[in-house]
């Protein structure tokens, strides 16, 4: 990518400056074609570890590897001209130590050319976030429901119902915001608490199943397009049913092949005279 191309791209610093302003638009992307389609409409594109479930049929994100994230990060970067691209750090790539997190984050940035990494965790990851940001790695935080912790959290469920959960999310938000993160995702958190946290922290909040008061919103693209039907979270709005349309197109193709309607004359080559 040229220097001019990089300058036209939205930076993490610009995302941070959008706090309290026009809502930040974010969707997931895992491939070059999808990135090209989404780029002009989004401020942020997230190469999420949700790709494990959406693309690879995994039951959770736990099985996603660093190499998988890097491969898909490269693919997305080939299709982007405007949006800021953030790549998830997968489970096991950053929790052990801040030094290991740094080495793996450097790999992601160097090998994909993306703009930032995202990692899950609040107070327990604040030191790691600070370590990375002080060394030139832009970091997006992720608090509330954390998919990489579903096996210890009792599954995918909204959080912030008890005083204990409420207190933890407040502490997590301030810890991540104070550690140098340029933004923080708040997932699956009760609306009043997500609204409160958004007002209390100085960095943009990106909601997913949180609140319209958040500084931005993110959803899984395959969810809003009707391409992933294993389950649909409560917080997802379907904007199309591409899965049904793809199935109908495949059925029409199969019918025409079996009835020898396809290929027709216009789809074949004639010998040159």
Swiss-Prot record:
<comment type="similarity">
    <text>Belongs to the PanB family.</text>
</comment>
<dbReference type="InterPro" id="IPR040442">
    <property type="entry name" value="Pyrv_kinase-like_dom_sf"/>
</dbReference>
<dbReference type="Pfam" id="PF02548">
    <property type="entry name" value="Pantoate_transf"/>
</dbReference>
<dbReference type="GO" id="GO:0005737">
    <property type="term" value="C:cytoplasm"/>
</dbReference>
<comment type="pathway">
    <text>Cofactor biosynthesis; (R)-pantothenate biosynthesis; (R)-pantoate from 3-methyl-2-oxobutanoate: step 1/2.</text>
</comment>
<dbReference type="InterPro" id="IPR015813">
    <property type="entry name" value="Pyrv/PenolPyrv_kinase-like_dom"/>
</dbReference>
<dbReference type="GO" id="GO:0015940">
    <property type="term" value="P:pantothenate biosynthetic process"/>
</dbReference>
<keyword id="KW-0566">Pantothenate biosynthesis</keyword>
<keyword id="KW-0963">Cytoplasm</keyword>
<feature type="binding site">
    <location>
        <position position="118"/>
    </location>
    <ligand>
        <name>3-methyl-2-oxobutanoate</name>
    </ligand>
</feature>
<feature type="binding site">
    <location>
        <begin position="49"/>
        <end position="50"/>
    </location>
    <ligand>
        <name>3-methyl-2-oxobutanoate</name>
    </ligand>
</feature>
<feature type="active site" description="Proton acceptor">
    <location>
        <position position="187"/>
    </location>
</feature>
<feature type="binding site">
    <location>
        <position position="88"/>
    </location>
    <ligand>
        <name>3-methyl-2-oxobutanoate</name>
    </ligand>
</feature>
<feature type="binding site">
    <location>
        <position position="120"/>
    </location>
    <ligand>
        <name>Mg(2+)</name>
    </ligand>
</feature>
<keyword id="KW-0460">Magnesium</keyword>
<keyword id="KW-0479">Metal-binding</keyword>
<keyword id="KW-0808">Transferase</keyword>
<comment type="function">
    <text>Catalyzes the reversible reaction in which hydroxymethyl group from 5,10-methylenetetrahydrofolate is transferred onto alpha-ketoisovalerate to form ketopantoate.</text>
</comment>
<feature type="binding site">
    <location>
        <position position="88"/>
    </location>
    <ligand>
        <name>Mg(2+)</name>
    </ligand>
</feature>
<feature type="binding site">
    <location>
        <position position="49"/>
    </location>
    <ligand>
        <name>Mg(2+)</name>
    </ligand>
</feature>
<protein>
    <recommendedName>
        <fullName>3-methyl-2-oxobutanoate hydroxymethyltransferase</fullName>
        <ecNumber>2.1.2.11</ecNumber>
    </recommendedName>
</protein>
<dbReference type="InterPro" id="IPR003700">
    <property type="entry name" value="Pantoate_hydroxy_MeTrfase"/>
</dbReference>
<dbReference type="GO" id="GO:0003864">
    <property type="term" value="F:3-methyl-2-oxobutanoate hydroxymethyltransferase activity"/>
</dbReference>
<keyword id="KW-0614">Plasmid</keyword>
<comment type="subunit">
    <text>Homodecamer; pentamer of dimers.</text>
</comment>
<dbReference type="GO" id="GO:0000287">
    <property type="term" value="F:magnesium ion binding"/>
</dbReference>
């Amino acid at each position: 990518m040229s220097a001019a191309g990089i300058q036209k791209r939205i930076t993490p610093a610009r995302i941070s400056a959008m706090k309290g302003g026009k809502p930040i638009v974010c969707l997931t992307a895992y491939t070059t074609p999808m990135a090209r389609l989404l780029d002009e409409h989004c401020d942020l594109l997230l190469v999420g570890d949700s790709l494990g479930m959406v693309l690879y049929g995994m039951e959770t994100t736990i099985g996603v590897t660093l190499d998988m994230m890097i491969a898909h990060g490269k693919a997305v970067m080939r299709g982007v001209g405007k949006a800021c691209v953030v790549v998830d750090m997968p489970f096991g790539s950053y929790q052990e130590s801040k030094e290991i997190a740094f080495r793996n984050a450097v790999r992601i940035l160097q090998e994909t050319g993306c703009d930032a990494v995202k990692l899950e965790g609040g107070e327990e990851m604040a030191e790691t976030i600070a370590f990375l940001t002080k060394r030139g790695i832009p970091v997006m935080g992720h608090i509330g429901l954390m998919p990489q912790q579903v096996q210890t959290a009792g599954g995918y469920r909204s959080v912030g119902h008890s005083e204990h959960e409420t207190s933890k999310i407040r502490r997590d938000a301030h810890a991540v915001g104070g550690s140098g993160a340029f933004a923080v995702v708040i997932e699956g958190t009760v609306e009043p608490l997500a609204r409160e946290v958004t007002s209390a922290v100085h960095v943009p909040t990106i909601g997913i199943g949180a609140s319209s008061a958040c500084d931005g919103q993110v959803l899984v693209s395959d969810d809003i397009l009707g391409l992933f039907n294993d389950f649909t979270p409560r917080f997802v709005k379907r904007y199309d049913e591409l899965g049904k349309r793809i199935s109908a197109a495949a059925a029409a193709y199969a019918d025409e092949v079996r009835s020898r309607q396809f290929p027709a004359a216009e789809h074949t080559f004639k010998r040159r005279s």
